[in-house]
Regions:
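N-terminal alpha-helical "arm" segments
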Residues: 2-52
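Active-site-proximal structural scaffolding
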Residues: 26-28, 139-142, 234
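Short, compositionally biased low-complexity segments
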Residues: 23-25, 114-121, 205-216
Length: 291
């Protein structure tokens, strides 16, 4: 078995041949998370697996493989359990500053930890290359593993596709609770579909929107709020709609309307030409609520 096939997969092969871990060759655009660290990477693989077993005692077959052996600089690792295979790249270099600003600045946690993240020294890239088909389950597998890196001076978990991040100690606390990660399932904009607020020059109000829903095959949503005080209101609306669409496999289109109670009606529309700042990968629907 060649190194390339073991790390990147081969069409004719299944998950494992002999004792080798095989990445799924049918995943072209894997979901991923990034972990940033204080100081140089100093990962003990055995302790990593022990922590994962501690978080989820039902895991019985967890194992890892270093396809390129022990590297002088950085990390190259495959971790496997059940249907899951996660590919890890590690670099003793700061994560790009522009991506950190994109994902950390709008996140809803304290400035002190944000400053530590901006000053981080190294990072890991985690990609899901296993055999679970459900994108949410792929994200949960990544999150379970990401939580285990707190012991190695990890600071935060970054989701670049979702333009958001969370402190790793918060994620580890959730993962260590019974069904704690269901919080991230119920509130997709916390980590898997980011919730971003920003002001646009010459536009009255605050734009609020999601990022990353396209990874689930869903549209992103946006709304023009009156003020930042409506953040929780729109966060809940986005969460509820995304969960409804994911669970029901329903489809929403521009022009659709929905009753919301209290004599309010929600309508959906596509971005207009002068709302170019809302356009990116995948579809986006703008929510308008009328009394």
């Amino acid at each position: 078995m060649g190194i390339f096939s073991r790390f990147f997969g081969k069409k004719s092969e299944s998950k494992q041949i002999g004792n080798s871990i095989i990445a799924n060759p049918d995943i072209d655009s894997p979901v991923g998370l990034t972990i940033v660290f204080k100081g140089a990477l100093d990962i003990n693989n055995d302790k990593l697996l022990t922590q994962l077993k501690s978080i989820d005692p039902t895991i019985k077959d967890i194992r890892y493989e270093m396809p390129f052996g022990q590297l002088e600089e950085g990390i190259c690792l495959l971790v496997s359990w059940g249907k899951h295979v996660i590919r890890i790249y590690g670099l003793n270099a700061p994560y790009p500053k522009d991506v950190l600003e994109l994902c950390v600045t709008p996140a809803n946690y304290g400035q002190e930890i944000k400053q530590q993240i901006y000053e981080s020294d190294s990072h890991l890239l985690l990609y899901y290359v296993g055999y679970e088909q459900d994108v949410l389950e792929q994200y949960l597998a990544l999150t379970h593993l990401a939580a285990c890196f707190e012991q190695f001076n990890a600071l935060a978990v970054i989701n670049e596709d979702a333009h958001t991040s969370l402190p790793v100690n918060f994620i580890n606390a959730l993962a260590s609770e019974n069904d704690g990660l269901t919080t991230l399932v119920a509130c997709l904009p916390l980590l898997f579909c980011g919730f971003v607020k920003y002001e646009i020059e010459n536009i009255k109000g605050i734009w609020m929107r999601t990022y990353g829903a396209n990874k689930f095959g869903l549209p992103n949503f946006a709304a023009l709020a009156n003020s930042y005080e409506e953040s929780e209101y729109y966060f809940d609306i986005f969460s509820n709609i995304l969960n409804y669409l994911r669970q029901s496999q329903a489809i929403m289109n521009p022009g659709d309307t929905m009753e919301m109670g209290d004599n309010r009606m929600m309508s959906l529309r596509a971005p207009q030409d002068d709302e170019y700042f809302l356009k990116d990968q995948g579809d986006l629907l703008i929510i308008e609520i009328n009394n």
